[in-house]
Swiss-Prot record:
<protein>
    <recommendedName>
        <fullName>Arginine--tRNA ligase</fullName>
        <ecNumber>6.1.1.19</ecNumber>
    </recommendedName>
</protein>
<dbReference type="InterPro" id="IPR005148">
    <property type="entry name" value="Arg-tRNA-synth_N"/>
</dbReference>
<keyword id="KW-0067">ATP-binding</keyword>
<dbReference type="GO" id="GO:0005524">
    <property type="term" value="F:ATP binding"/>
</dbReference>
<dbReference type="InterPro" id="IPR008909">
    <property type="entry name" value="DALR_anticod-bd"/>
</dbReference>
<dbReference type="InterPro" id="IPR036695">
    <property type="entry name" value="Arg-tRNA-synth_N_sf"/>
</dbReference>
<dbReference type="Pfam" id="PF05746">
    <property type="entry name" value="DALR_1"/>
</dbReference>
<comment type="subunit">
    <text>Monomer.</text>
</comment>
<comment type="similarity">
    <text>Belongs to the class-I aminoacyl-tRNA synthetase family.</text>
</comment>
<dbReference type="InterPro" id="IPR035684">
    <property type="entry name" value="ArgRS_core"/>
</dbReference>
<dbReference type="InterPro" id="IPR014729">
    <property type="entry name" value="Rossmann-like_a/b/a_fold"/>
</dbReference>
<keyword id="KW-0963">Cytoplasm</keyword>
<dbReference type="GO" id="GO:0004814">
    <property type="term" value="F:arginine-tRNA ligase activity"/>
</dbReference>
<keyword id="KW-0436">Ligase</keyword>
<feature type="short sequence motif" description="'HIGH' region">
    <location>
        <begin position="131"/>
        <end position="141"/>
    </location>
</feature>
<keyword id="KW-0547">Nucleotide-binding</keyword>
<dbReference type="Pfam" id="PF00750">
    <property type="entry name" value="tRNA-synt_1d"/>
</dbReference>
């Protein structure tokens, strides 16, 4: 249960009970009332700004109104004390019995504690990675892959019906270049000396194997075909090979998509999907024939000094109108974006999230304009931009390229430090802030390494369970037994740990609402820190040890507390896509 939502309802009920009315009549607007943990834990357990946001409407001084509300809240049987602070904040301190009761709820819910119905089954499409199928994934793709994957997991946990999607850019000019590059490697595999890879082609050694496979399958047959026919075969085989490589890289990072959508699908049957999308926009008055003025600065690739078929995107929030067709009659890449969005919308998605690299910042307004025009403003589109990742080793910068045509790949990073450190650390900054990734720091066993610190807390929980088996003979811990004596948890440090656990449902919902999965990584670190501190208190003070052999009821209660910590760590790490270890190796 989200205790903050619970007290939000209690506070609003209290406002009704004291018959609080606007001075000008009508109903009070309660939408701006906030209920959250105080910034300073010493101020209490629950804080609300109710008096400050309502004072003007009711015509009363904020502190006087706060005192009036506070007095009424004291009647709540779960409230120990209520104080008014500052300009009119109301701080509530709750009774230990309330926290003990909530801990029992958490224990009974297990790893489902924190799961929310916020999304109410609403369909959401999260598109992420969508790297061009021209080679292995480099480390720059890594952050978007993790952010998108964890956000999708988070939204699922918050009650949304989520589809994870990858858009395969397999219809552009870069694919023609890729096919020619592989054709060269095919000839090389047949024994031809190809010399230096010509400028403009892909020089990477990863294409050598594709050329060899083609030589093994076709022998010299491709050389005997018309070039266009041969290149079409090479293109298909190469895209399949590149996507197999990309899927393997993503699998190593524990990133999995539900849908791989080929751009070429939009171009079948004379690009029927694109034509239909443009026709729909035309019927809505969003398409016209016109001439764009030359933009200031560097000219974009799709600008031409002629009359063009244009999307009237400035009327739906964009900076300039966008060309839909080129001078040769083919469609612009943007026209494909329109058709792809329409395809998603037609599949029943009213909410779409695009996770893109920071270099795609110029796409945000045009994509938002497409969403408004295609859906008549009914669909919600969000673009999350991921800033660059800089690699370091012991504080020294690491070059991103290894040699000509080669670069540090996602697989290089995962193979060196492991999947879990990569996933966790890619979340340890908000996606729109640059991130430094130090190979040495993410593998050190210290508090300064967040992923180690969190996973170590999980392992410590299980070490407590093993101690319970050794010292108390409790091999199979029973949740009913563990939850039957929570009234014995009275030490302030234990109640403080319960408070931290109680924040989890609110954290899940707020991270989902704001689409900020990094909040989960920060919370897990804070929870781990609280648990490690409690462990250390037991080391310093025998009365606070989790297991008291001479007091089995207290031991069971504390084991129940440890079980909930373990459950929340497991839940959060599962959403992040990392393991919750039972022991550290």
């Amino acid at each position: 249960m989200n205790i903050f939502a619970d007290f939000d309802a209690r506070i609003k009920k209290t406002l009704q009970d004291i018959d609080l009315k606007p001075k000008d009549g009508g109903e009070l607007d309660l939408s701006r009332i906030g209920v959250e943990p105080p910034r300073d834990a010493s101020h209490g357990d629950i804080a609300t700004n109710a008096a400050m946001v309502l004072s003007k409407a009711v015509g009363q001084n904020p502190r006087e109104l706060a005192a009036r509300i506070a007095e009424a809240l004291k009647a709540d049987e779960d409230v120990e004390s209520v104080d008014v602070a500052g300009p009119g904040f109301i701080n509530l301190r709750l009774k230990a019995s309330y926290w003990q009761r909530e801990l029992l709820v958490m224990l009974n819910e297990g790893t489902d504690f924190g799961r929310s119905r916020l999304g109410a089954g609403k369909k959401v499409n999260v598109e992420y990675v969508s790297a061009n199928p021209t080679g292995p994934m480099h480390v720059g793709h890594c952050r978007g892959a993790v952010v998108g994957d964890v956000l999708a997991n988070l939204l699922k946990f918050a009650g949304y019906d989520v589809v994870k999607e990858y858009y395969i850019n397999d219809a552009g000019a870069q694919i023609d270049v890729l096919a020619r590059s592989v054709m060269l490697r095919y000839r090389e595999a047949l024994g031809e000396s190809i010399g230096e890879i010509p400028a403009g082609l892909y020089p990477g050694d990863y294409l050598v194997r594709v050329g060899q496979e083609l030589a093994g399958e076709f022998g010299t047959k491709l050389l005997e075909m018309p070039e266009a026919e041969a290149l079409a075969i090479v293109k298909d085989r190469t895209i399949d090979a590149m996507m197999a490589m990309i899927r393997a890289d993503l699998d190593a990072l524990n990133v999995h998509h539900d849908v791989f959508y080929s751009e070429r699908k939009l171009h079948v049957d004379h690009a029927r999907a694109i034509r239909n999308a443009i026709n729909d926009l035309t019927l809505k008055g969003h398409v016209y024939k016109g001439k764009l003025p030359p933009p200031k600065g560097q000219l974009p690739e799709d600008w031409e000094d002629r009359e063009q078929t244009l999307f009237r995107s400035t009327e739906v929030g964009d900076d300039i109108d966008r060309p839909l067709m080129k001078s040769d009659g083919s469609f612009t890449y943007f026209a494909g974006d329109v058709a792809y969005f329409k395809d998603k919308y037609d599949r029943g998605f009213n909410e779409m999230i695009y996770v893109l690299g920071a270099d795609h910042g110029g796409y945000v307004k045009r994509l938002e304009a497409v969403a408004r025009a295609v859906s008549d403003g009914k669909a919600k589109l969000t673009v999350l931009l991921c800033q660059l990742v800089k690699l370091f080793r012991n504080g020294e910068p690491v070059r991103m390229s290894k040699r000509a045509g080669e670069f540090i790949t996602l697989r290089d990073v995962v193979d060196e430090v492991g999947r879990d450190p990569v996933r966790f650390m890619m979340l340890y900054r908000k996606n729109d802030a640059p991130l430094d990734f130090d190979f040495a720091k993410v593998t050190e066993q210290s508090k300064d390494n967040p992923v180690f610190y969190v996973q170590y807390a999980s392992a410590r929980c299980h070490s407590v369970f093993r101690q319970a088996a050794d010292q108390l003979g409790l091999v199979d811990l029973d949740r009913v037994a563990m939850g039957s004596h929570f009234e014995k948890l009275t030490d302030e440090s234990e109640i403080a740990l319960v408070r931290k656990l109680a924040e989890y449902p609110r954290l899940i919902e707020s991270a989902a609402i704001h689409q900020e999965p990094h909040r989960l990584a920060f919370y897990l670190y804070d929870l781990a820190s609280s648990f490690h501190s409690q462990w250390n208190r037991g080391t310093e003070n025998p009365d606070l040890r989790f297991i008291k052999v001479n007091d089995p009821d207290l031991s069971l209660a504390r084991l129940g507390l440890v079980q909930v910590v373990s459950d929340v760590l497991t839940s959060g790490l599962t959403i992040i896509g990392a393991d919750a270890p039972t022991e550290m190796r």
